[in-house]
């Protein structure tokens, strides 16, 4: 019986890197709402008392970057200077310029179906049947913990919580099946007047126990709640934040490979984002069709070229048909050219700010989580 442990982490919406991601995607959404064909690459840097928004944008839209930034920070919960960051008093610097015409000529085409990829690169998508949302369990429950932290902070259940938080969950497996949770780490920013014992009890009873399935917890499960003992200084005052620095949190928690490209602040012509979403869509439909228990898709592109330079499938020995058959099915049922996948998933619209915290995958509100191709895939696989 093969035993192993696997760990994934997540961070809350108030983590500095996630503040940056949410601002970048708020800008993207505001532009796409006015101009669905806009080209946007928006990067954000946050530190004590300041936000710098930069990047390259080609659009007919006008958006108020300063107001968008303040609104986003306010909604996250940084509204007092004693937190080291205040939506209403922080400086907002705008350093956005225009996209290079050299990139435009490689992407734009008279026939939109032949739209070239906005850059070269490789992207991965993954799905696993170990949870009902066809996501790996470690990242799923790591997200659930910090999402719960945000809920009980915002609704006043635990009023001493502050926006910055991190979680980490270690699952125990036997023969690749979950047998329990080995360790849980949850660190949450808090007001200075809460006693450590009260914090630990509140986090355990209000966040951890309602979120993690009791059958996976046992007497040997280890809990680390604010293990340094104090977490008052957090958010951008504790660490600077940058767009695109939480790419494993954003995806599969390390359970699948990653091509290296970040998502937030990028319009759908950037295959770093759109093709990673399409690859998840493909992998999830293959698993939903029962063609594999686990599936990882890789696609790659050349700048200015519409057709992917490669498509590959890995099922880790769980495939019910050969990987050659799966690749043929993928090519038959999914258009993975940049324009095709944007149309297939209806990506040219303002849906991205919601992706920028608590993971881009495993959330039913997003179109790449649909399993509408599963039945046709299963039929054509002739299982």
Swiss-Prot record:
Which positions in this protein are listed as binding L-methionine? Answer: 56, 99, 239, 270
The answer on whether this UniProt entry bears the keyword Repressor reads no
Q: Set out the biological process GO terms recorded for this chain's protein.
A: one-carbon metabolic process; S-adenosylmethionine biosynthetic process
Task: Identify the pathway.
Answer: Amino-acid biosynthesis; S-adenosyl-L-methionine biosynthesis; S-adenosyl-L-methionine from L-methionine: step 1/1
**Keyword Magnesium attributed:** yes
Spell out the InterPro entries in the cross-references. Answer: ADOMET_SYNTHASE_CS, S-AdoMet_synt_C, S-AdoMet_synt_central, S-AdoMet_synt_N, S-AdoMet_synthetase, S-AdoMet_synthetase_sfam
Q: What is its main location?
A: cytoplasm
Any idea which positions bind Mg(2+)?
A: 17
The UniProt subunit note reads as follows: Homotetramer; dimer of dimers.
Q: What is this protein called?
A: S-adenosylmethionine synthase
According to the record, how does the cofactor bind? Binds 2 divalent ions per subunit. Binds 1 potassium ion per subunit.
Write the Enzyme Commission number(s) for this entry. Answer: 2.5.1.6
Q: Where in the cell is it found?
A: Cytoplasm
Q: Which residues bind ATP?
A: 15, 164-166, 230-231, 239, 245-246, 262, 266
* Described purpose of this protein according to its UniProt entry: Catalyzes the formation of S-adenosylmethionine (AdoMet) from methionine and ATP. The overall synthetic reaction is composed of two sequential steps, AdoMet formation and the subsequent tripolyphosphate hydrolysis which occurs prior to release of AdoMet from the enzyme.
| Cofactors demanded by this protein | Mg(2+); K(+)
One GO MF term, please? methionine adenosyltransferase activity
- Reactions mediated catalytically: L-methionine + ATP + H2O = S-adenosyl-L-methionine + phosphate + diphosphate
User: What residues does K(+) bind to?
Assistant: 43
Q: Which Pfam families match?
A: S-AdoMet_synt_C (PF02773), S-AdoMet_synt_M (PF02772), S-AdoMet_synt_N (PF00438)
Q: Name one GO cellular component term.
A: cytosol
Q: Per the similarity annotation, which family is this?
A: Belongs to the AdoMet synthase family.
Q: Where is this region: Flexible loop?
A: 99-109
Sorted keywords for this record are: ATP-binding, Cytoplasm, Magnesium, Metal-binding, Nucleotide-binding, One-carbon metabolism, Potassium, Transferase
